[in-house]
From Swiss-Prot:
The active site is at H251, C299. This is Caspase-12. The lineage of its organism: Eukaryota, Metazoa, Chordata, Craniata, Vertebrata. Residues 1-92 form the CARD domain. InterPro entries: CARD, Caspase-like_dom_sf, Caspase_cys_AS, Caspase_his_AS, DEATH-like_dom_sf, Pept_C14, Pept_C14_caspase, Pept_C14_p10. Involved in the activation cascade of caspases responsible for apoptosis execution.
Length: 420
């Protein structure tokens, strides 16, 4: 039927032309603003071509049924240019957010936070129309190019007015922050993780931009990982540092991070307790009262972490342990301190469930984590950034996982203040 109509009178041809012109304009803007690179644009273009091709077949079907149905469908497509819009942040965004976080009154601050969340949601709603045409894998791994920096005035204001609520942050001059990345890519018995190089490079770049000197160790057994952690904990630079990051990327099971010799018959696993023990206040005094952030990209089981739920309400129960009896001893010659404080662990999935990666784009968790750090760490504290990452996984998709915040013993808020 399509062959009988000329291009000049063919509504399908007109719609395809309109859609192509509109998408070309959007893609040009995305390239100009460095939102997409050439490879990403090519992948999106392939997805858009597929959608246009499928849309042509669908519209043809409507025209064969009735002329009116075709007009209705064509009208909706023709009006799509009003929906396909991107809202970019204004130049005074930083000033607005600084006002929002200025500690005046609790009610005023809360109101401004709600306003900011509304603005962010509006921007997401507009952008989502374009994202509908992007393949799932590209959506999930798209990362903002540059780290947004914190102004000097904002840094000084927060350090002064919220000194009792936040962890002390040292001045850049003389500060010797260290971060450790352990990544296992080659395994004796498990599948290799060749695409993990993307995660290593992106995490290294992020941590360096945050002021950390990054140590990278690859392809270690559990015992070798423990040895490297002990060496890192003993580094003298921690004395003149205000925090540290420990990043683990490997295969994993519920009990911990897999070493390169792991197999079911003979496990090779670095347990969480081992990590926390090495860096606790007793064994790593240089990092006492300083934030110790653990990032773990690894599966924690083989389940997908999704279920089908009904609208009926269920009842949850939990068992409780008996009360622990504590004995207090006083000694005038020493100061009592908690064995484990100032830790937070952010893991890529819930217990028993898997973590996803998408080819050479790296893992979903690491890419979302880096994206949220680049967007929000100039103004949000660490736990709020982690919640932003969790929010990005809130709606289950084809690749489903839910990052979890665990073993939190931080007593204050930790701000990174990038650029300071």
């Amino acid at each position: 039927m399509a062959a009988k109509r000329t291009h000049e009178r063919d509504p399908i041809y007109k719609i395809k032309g309109l859609a192509k012109d509109m998408l070309d304009g959007v893609f040009d803007d995305l390239m100009d603003k460095n939102v997409l690179n050439g490879d990403e644009l090519l992948k999106i273009g392939e997805g858009a071509s597929l959608i246009l091709s499928k849309a042509e077949n669908l519209v043809e079907s409507f025209f064969e049924k009735t002329e009116m149905a075709g007009k209705i469908f064509a009208g909706h497509i023709a009006n799509s240019d009003k929906q396909l819009s991107l809202q970019f942040p204004s130049d005074d965004e930083e000033d607005e957010l600084q006002k929002m976080f200025t500690p005046s009154s609790a009610s005023e601050s809360r109101g401004k936070v709600e306003d900011e969340e509304m603005e962010v949601n509006v921007g997401v709603a507009h952008a989502s129309h374009l994202m509908l045409t992007v393949p799932q894998g590209i959506q999930s791994t798209e990362v903002q190019d540059s780290l947004k920096l914190c102004s000097r005035d904002w840094f000084c204001t927060m350090k002064t007015e919220r000194a009792e609520e936040i962890y002390p942050v040292m001045e850049k001059e003389g500060r010797t922050r260290l971060a450790l990345i352990i990544c296992n890519k080659k395994f004796d018995y498990l599948f290799d993780r060749d695409d993990a190089e993307t995660d290593i490079l992106n995490m290294k770049e992020l941590l360096q931009n945050l002021g950390y000197s990054v140590v990278i160790k690859e392809n270690l057994t559990a015992q070798e990982m423990e040895t490297e952690l002990m060496k890192f904990a003993g580094r003298p630079e921690h004395q003149s540092s205000d925090s540290t990051f420990l990043v683990f990327m490997s295969h994993g099971i519920l009990e911990g991070i897999c070493g390169v010799k792991h197999r079911n018959k003979k496990p090779d696993v670095l347990h969480d307790d081992t990590i926390f023990t090495i860096f606790n206040n007793s064994n790593c005094p240089s990092l006492r009262n300083k934030p110790k952030i653990l990032i773990m990209q690894a599966c924690r089981g083989r389940h997908t972490g999704t279920i089908w739920v009904s609208t009926s309400k269920g009842i949850a129960t939990a068992d409780t342990d008996e009360e622990c009896v504590l004995s207090h001893r006083w000694n005038n010659s020493i100061t009592k301190a908690h064995v484990e404080t100032d830790f937070i662990a952010f893991k890529s999935s819930t217990p028993h469930n898997i973590s996803w990666k998408v080819g050479k784009s790296g893992s979903l968790f690491i890419s979302k984590l880096i994206d949220c750090f680049k967007k929000y760490c100039w103004c949000y504290h660490l736990e709020e950034i982690f919640r932003k990452v969790q929010y990005s996984f809130e709606v289950p998709g084809e690749l489903t996982q839910m990052p979890t915040i665990e073993r939190v013993s931080m007593t204050r808020y930790f701000y990174l203040f990038p650029g300071n």
